[in-house]
């Protein structure tokens, strides 16, 4: 079994390209992770996700602990076997979903108490329990439990939240079962305050996580302010560890973040947009529901190798989406995930060649 490692092969200014080696294979970076919230990427076969070029996908601890339960998934052989995915899986800690989905959520020093949005059952998610759930799932990369600081937040509220995240990170690290090829990432918080972000990094680096995520962004602050934070946070982080920007996936955001030193991304944008009839292309976005595509004999993209582009016209995709045929969202999602993997591949190539890669429309 391979040890967990991160090797940087190329630099271009602050951007890096390399390979993360794990127990479940290699991840080419910069990497985009499709979101498989409940053990499936919506509207996609697992085999189809592989064909898009994805090296890793994301699972959701909160949803999987509720249905079908971490214990059941462990009994059935772990999340990899359960969903027939043999590449790396990163699972989030569940904290963000608890705080955003549960109407009766209470945050204390111990953890987060909440009621299931499914049946109202009461749960307590602690750093230790979140880490245990991810162990049962067999996650390649486990995330430490954090409190996602809302935006806007005052300096004092952000400071209190950041320190709670630090204490939870220490408990998560103590609970993590170290195994060859597996990793745990800590999550940097501090809202938009440089002093707090720097302190968060200093505190979490002491835990010696295998990688570090930047949380609390893409929560309403806007791209300009997000980039302002990313102008300095990566500089505080260890150069030899992967950097993961959580929940960010607009192509222009990815480009800007990679140029500031980020290595990993996840977002529901390509899948959600696909289900709603929006396609990403190198020429810009296409709303396939628009009536102007009803007689369009061209594919979404001529040089895209996904089934939607190699086999069908925009007119056919328009027809499927307008009549709400389930094949429509499937093909649109397949195309979007292929677009995002192609985007990451182009970025990696441009970094290797030492060229600017601001080519997103």
Swiss-Prot record:
GO terms for molecular function: metal ion binding; tRNA-guanosine(34) queuine transglycosylase activity. Residues 247-253, 271-275 are annotated as: RNA binding. Substrate binds at residues 92-96, 146, 189, 216. The active site is at 92 (proton acceptor), 266 (nucleophile). It catalyses: 7-aminomethyl-7-carbaguanine + guanosine(34) in tRNA = 7-aminomethyl-7-carbaguanosine(34) in tRNA + guanine. It holds the Pfam family TGT. Its EC number is 2.4.2.29. Keywords: Glycosyltransferase, Metal-binding, Queuosine biosynthesis, Transferase, tRNA processing, Zinc. One of its GO terms (biological process) is queuosine biosynthetic process. Pathway: tRNA modification; tRNA-queuosine biosynthesis. The keyword Nucleus does not apply. Gene3D superfamilies: Queuine tRNA-ribosyltransferase-like. Binds 1 zinc ion per subunit. Its cofactor is Zn(2+). Zn(2+) binds at residues 304, 306, 309, 335. GO terms for cellular component: cytoplasm. PANTHER family: QUEUINE TRNA-RIBOSYLTRANSFERASE. Belongs to the queuine tRNA-ribosyltransferase family. Catalyzes the base-exchange of a guanine (G) residue with the queuine precursor 7-aminomethyl-7-deazaguanine (PreQ1) at position 34 (anticodon wobble position) in tRNAs with GU(N) anticodons (tRNA-Asp, -Asn, -His and -Tyr). Catalysis occurs through a double-displacement mechanism. The nucleophile active site attacks the C1' of nucleotide 34 to detach the guanine base from the RNA, forming a covalent enzyme-RNA intermediate. The proton acceptor active site deprotonates the incoming PreQ1, allowing a nucleophilic attack on the C1' of the ribose to form the product. Homodimer. Within each dimer, one monomer is responsible for RNA recognition and catalysis, while the other monomer binds to the replacement base PreQ1. This is Queuine tRNA-ribosyltransferase. The gene is tgt.
């Amino acid at each position: 079994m391979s040890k967990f490692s991160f090797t940087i092969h190329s630099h271009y200014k602050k951007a890096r390209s390399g390979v993360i080696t794990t127990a479940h294979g290699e991840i080419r970076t910069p990497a985009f992770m499709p979101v498989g919230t409940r053990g499936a990427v919506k509207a996609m076969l697992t085999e189809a996700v592989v064909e898009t070029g994805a090296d890793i996908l994301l699972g959701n601890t909160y949803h999987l602990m509720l249905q079908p339960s971490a214990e059941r998934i462990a009994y059935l052989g772990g999340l990899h076997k359960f969903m027939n995915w043999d590449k790396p899986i990163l699972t989030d800690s569940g904290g963000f979903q608890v705080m955003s989905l549960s109407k009766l959520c209470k945050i204390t020093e111990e953890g987060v108490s909440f009621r299931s949005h499914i049946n109202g059952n009461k749960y307590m998610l602690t750093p230790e329990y979140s880490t245990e759930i991810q162990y049962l799932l067999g996650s390649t990369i486990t995330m430490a439990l954090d409190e996602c600081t809302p935006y806007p937040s005052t300096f004092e509220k952000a400071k209190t939240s950041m320190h709670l995240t630090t204490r939870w990170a220490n408990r998560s690290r103590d609970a993590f079962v170290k195994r060859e090829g597996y990793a745990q990432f800590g999550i940097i918080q501090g809202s938009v305050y440089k002093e707090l972000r720097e302190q968060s990094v200093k505190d979490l680096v002491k835990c010696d996580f295998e990688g570090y995520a930047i949380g609390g962004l893409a929560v309403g602050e806007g791209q300009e302010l997000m980039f302002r934070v990313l102008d300095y946070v990566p500089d505080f982080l260890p150069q030899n560890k992967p950097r993961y920007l959580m929940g960010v996936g607009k192509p222009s955001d990815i480009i800007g973040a990679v140029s500031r030193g980020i290595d990993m991304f996840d977002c529901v944008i390509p899948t959600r947009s696909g289900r709603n009839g929006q396609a990403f292309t190198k020429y810009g976005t296409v709303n396939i529901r628009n009536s102007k595509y009803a007689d369009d004999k061209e594919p979404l993209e001529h040089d895209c190798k996904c089934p939607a582009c190699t086999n069908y016209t925009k007119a056919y995709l328009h027809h499927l989406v307008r009549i709400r045929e389930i094949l429509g969202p499937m093909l649109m999602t397949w195309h979007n995930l292929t677009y995002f993997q192609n985007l990451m591949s182009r970025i990696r190539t441009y970094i290797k060649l030492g060229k600017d890669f601001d080519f997103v429309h």
